[in-house]
């Protein structure tokens, strides 16, 4: 790999780690703090809506955690030179994160800001890693 490629890979791994950390945070919000007064405004839910959707949010939170774990394991794999397996895991994790953000944007345009926050770091990770692995 070229020096430029290695720099792109390093930057991509940083963005993948940020995406993973964000999804761990979302996991905590959805699975444990869903009905909390400070959490509800972030998701645009009333007390009644939050209570009614608590079980769904709990499960969705774990989905986000699993995406974060897949991505984190991929990062570790790349760092210990299991590059092919690590890249596959990172692309699966961040690709799913990005696609989920796109689905959110398309189906709930009023949640555009959340979709952008959710999708930016995975997108940057995917772009940088793709370029880095090519170089």
Locate predicted features.
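N-terminal signal-anchor transmembrane alpha helix
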Residues: 9-33
């Amino acid at each position: 790999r070229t020096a430029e490629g290695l720099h792109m890979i390093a930057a991509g791994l940083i963005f993948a780690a940020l995406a993973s950390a964000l999804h761990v945070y979302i996991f905590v919000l959805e699975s444990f703090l869903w009905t909390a007064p400070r959490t509800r405004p972030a998701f645009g839910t009333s007390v009644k809506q939050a209570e009614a959707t608590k079980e769904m949010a709990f499960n969705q939170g774990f989905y986000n955690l699993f995406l974060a774990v897949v991505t984190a394991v991929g990062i570790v794999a790349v760092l210990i030179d299991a590059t092919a397996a690590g890249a596959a895991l990172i692309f699966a994790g961040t690709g799913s994160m990005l696609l989920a953000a796109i689905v959110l944007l398309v189906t709930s345009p009023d949640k555009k800001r959340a979709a952008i926050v959710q999708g930016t770091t995975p997108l940057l990770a995917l772009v940088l890693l793709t370029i880095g692995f090519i170089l």
